[in-house]
Amino acid sequence: MFEIHPVKKVSVVIPVYNEQESLPELIRRTTKACESLGKEYEILLIDDGSSDNSAHMLVEASQAENSHIVSILLNRNYGQHSAIMAGFSHVTGDLIITLDADLQNPPEEIPRLVAKADEGYDVVGTVRQNRQDSWFRKTASKMINRLIQRTTGKAMGDYGCMLRAYRRHIVDAMLHCHERSTFIPILANIFARRAIEIPVHHAEREFGESKYSFMRLINLMYDLVTCLTTTPLRMLSLLGSIIAIGGFSIAVLLVILRLTFGPQWAAEGVFMLFAVLFTFIGAQFIGMGLLGEYIGRIYTDVRARPRYFVQQVIRPSSKENE
């Protein structure tokens, strides 16, 4: 049996990208939620190369009197999950909570995650109730969740919700992983001994627009498929075997029909032959594209470039800046 250690300090990690409108409310509500815990806490806000005034606002928040905010400024935009990993490398708490900056996941849910983690869970996930997103976002999310569940075998209901709590040893384990394509919720579940999900509220986005465009969602799907499992390669081999057997069977059938009905019948089956040919060609291109994705990610990992570069870390005035 593993001993259950109570949470002593909470670190809240929030990636920020062009969120100047929501930042004041985000900081106020998150601070209030953390103060209600009656524990030590820190709020780490990571500016992911914002082009608006977000970085300046984060610096001011860290330098305010009695601030608990640590601002981490990246030199450019690296993506949500890389920004969160940058925050993980600077946390000091024994429970780390991730939260989006758009306030669709209410910071007021933080005490519930802490209470559940105190029961001994390594990872506390969340499932959004009554999602206030567009039909396209909800449909894409359902497809991605099903894809993840089938390829990884991890039965979690809502991988897209970033409001989650991780014990410190889970975060330390993730920091030892050096692959460039990272999806934090799944990576955490690989190391978790005990994980659970709880329902949380989901609000409409009050400020700005979602930073996930259609193409970024497509890239995310490829990241999920190629960086976490080799199942698609095995499925590709199975599909190739089925197509090969099907093609051989059709060839035998065509020979039998030609011998039975004569060469005149074969001329009338030209379009069928073209259809079969195009099917094979399409399957080959799909396979080549998938293999290319894997090879591209291998190439990226072999280069071993850092997944992010921290330009500056601003801690509260009582602590030294880095």
UniProtKB/Swiss-Prot annotation:
Transmembrane segments: 236-256, 270-290
Keyword Lipid biosynthesis belongs to the record: yes
Stretches assigned to the Periplasmic side: 257-269
Top EC class for this record: transferase
Matching InterPro entries: ArnC_tfrase, Glyco_trans_2-like, Glycosyltransferase_2, Nucleotide-diphossugar_trans
A Gene Ontology BP annotation from the UniProt entry: lipid A biosynthetic process
PANTHER family, per database record: UNDECAPRENYL-PHOSPHATE 4-DEOXY-4-FORMAMIDO-L-ARABINOSE TRANSFERASE, UNDECAPRENYL-PHOSPHATE 4-DEOXY-4-FORMAMIDO-L-ARABINOSE TRANSFERASE-RELATED
Protein name: Undecaprenyl-phosphate 4-deoxy-4-formamido-L-arabinose transferase
Record EC number: 2.4.2.53
